[in-house]
Structures are given as C-alpha cells and as structure tokens.
Amino acid sequence: MGRIFLDHIGGTRLFSCANCDTILTNRSELISTRFTGATGRAFLFNKVVNLQYSEVQDRVMLTGRHMVRDVSCKNCNSKLGWIYEFATEDSQRYKEGRVILERALVRESEGFEEHVPSDNS
C-alpha cells in the first residue's frame, strides 16, 4: 500500500475521527445536529475530507428512501456515517451530497485561528 495523503480543512472547532484523530471537517461546515444514526445522535455536514466511500446502497430511512454510501476514515478505516447520493422525495433533496457523521464516532476539539498578514505588518 502506498502513502496516504490527508487534507486539512482548518477552522477554530474541528471534528476528527474518534479512533485515530484524523481531521474530517470543521464547525462552519455543520448544517444540522438533529439527525440520528445507528449509534445515536448524528450531525449533517456540507463538506467533509479524508473519507473513503462504500458502494451505493438503497436505504429506507425515517425520512424516506435514499441512495447512500457508508463513509469511513481514510486513515484507519473506522466507520463514521454516510453520504446522501440521492433522495427520492423533493423535501429531502437538500441532503444530496451532504455527509452524516455519527457523534459517537467523531471527536470535537479546538482548532486554530488563521491569521492572514495584512499589508501593514
């Protein structure tokens, strides 16, 4: 196996894999905390990095039928949640391309503030 290249999304509040601490996303990408996964509470994010994706699966969920892929950590292969590929109901289309991370499988921590130098420095 070759080298694994990981991305870093930056931000002041970071979400990382609970198993290996690989950075996945930040607080500014959070859309909703009102989701439920197999392990309990789950969060919907706009952009998540450092993921591996399973094959597409047809699942019937509480909100209807969806085409989804399970997502796991690119670094350690731990399951983290899923990504919505397609929603059959118009009211659920906002989820398409968005990622669910299960709260029990990720860790939230302090990130860092990026200071961009000004012309006066």
UniProtKB/Swiss-Prot annotation:
Any one Gene Ontology cellular component term annotated for this protein: mitotic spindle pole
Residues carrying Phosphoserine: S118
Pfam family, one: Yippee-Mis18
Record-level Gene Ontology MF annotations: metal ion binding
Binding site for Zn(2+): C17, C20, C73, C76
Yippee domain ranges (all copies): 13-110
GO biological process, one term: cell population proliferation
Subcellular location, record wording: Nucleus; Cytoplasm, Cytoskeleton, Microtubule organizing center, Centrosome; Cytoplasm, Cytoskeleton, Spindle pole; Midbody
Entry-linked InterPro entries: Yippee (IPR034751), Yippee/Mis18/Cereblon (IPR004910), Yippee_fam (IPR039058)
Keyword set, alphabetical order: Cytoplasm, Cytoskeleton, Metal-binding, Nucleus, Phosphoprotein, Zinc
Subunit: Identified in the CTLH complex that contains GID4, RANBP9 and/or RANBP10, MKLN1, MAEA, RMND5A (or alternatively its paralog RMND5B), GID8, ARMC8, WDR26 and YPEL5. Within this complex, MAEA, RMND5A (or alternatively its paralog RMND5B), GID8, WDR26, and RANBP9 and/or RANBP10 form the catalytic core, while GID4, MKLN1, ARMC8 and YPEL5 have ancillary roles. Interacts with RANBP9 and RANBP10.
Function: Component of the CTLH E3 ubiquitin-protein ligase complex that selectively accepts ubiquitin from UBE2H and mediates ubiquitination and subsequent proteasomal degradation of the transcription factor HBP1. Required for normal cell proliferation.
Family recorded in the similarity comment: Belongs to the yippee family.
Protein name: Protein yippee-like 5
Source organism of this protein record: Homo sapiens (Human)
